């Protein structure tokens, strides 16, 4: 069992593993959880990785444990994964703060991630999810939509707002650009959570994330926006909670009227950023929901309009038991 750390990062599923590989060397307290050995990379070790195996029937009807992934089947993934979550959380215990990284469009990550978040939040831990919505296929779109609903379910069950930092895989945007944005967010969160800044302690971070404990607000899914200047932060509609970091205290200017605001001052000799703002709001979740709905409507129209061809078989053709046909 690992000891308590300041920030634990959990990389879940295939997308999580790929991000974790890119993030290697930036933070040491990381771990990986998946259902497929095919997603393992050179930085995975027995100490930092758990691969959940499923009972699989072979051709001779014998059963065998195999780690071959879940084929984007979220229901099957949930049936396999749910019983393992307490043991995973025990093996990789929560840090003072926690980041969980996964895709919404697959199966393993989109079930491991929210299940782990639910478990940790029910233990009172501070958790932020960094998630990737996907529109590239019908099943990825349906899984992303189901994941968004799952986040609301996790909020309801844990009685803690589920905080997501949201990214999208969409046409015209290279995967490398999406990955780079995620890496910037992870670096920023690790800095925010490192407990090294003047006037910003762990309780300040806890109050920022668990704003619902001090204000009469709905316990729902909320979105975290990571902003690198004041104008960007001010553009976020209806902010609920803001944490800000400055390397120059004289740059500290009120951004907006919010329920919770906490500010810290980072060492300018150690960090080269001017300011960072971590803005939580709820209204942006509605934008995500609408985009997913619009995409599903487009997908349904495309399926309905898909041309169907006539079979090459006619009523007189006879197929063998193997499907062979002789003209």
Swiss-Prot record:
One CC-aspect GO term: host cell cytoplasm
InterPro entries, A to Z: PhuZ_C (IPR054768), Tubulin/FtsZ_GTPase_sf (IPR036525)
Activity regulation details: The non-hydrolyzable GTP analog GMPCPP stabilizes filaments, which never disassemble.
Name of a matching Pfam family: TubZ_C_2
Subcellular location: Host cytoplasm
Origin superkingdom: Viruses
Subunit composition and interactions: Homomultimer. Polymerizes in a strictly GTP-dependent manner.
Listed name of the protein: Phage tubulin-like protein
Source organism of this protein record: Pseudomonas phage phiKZ
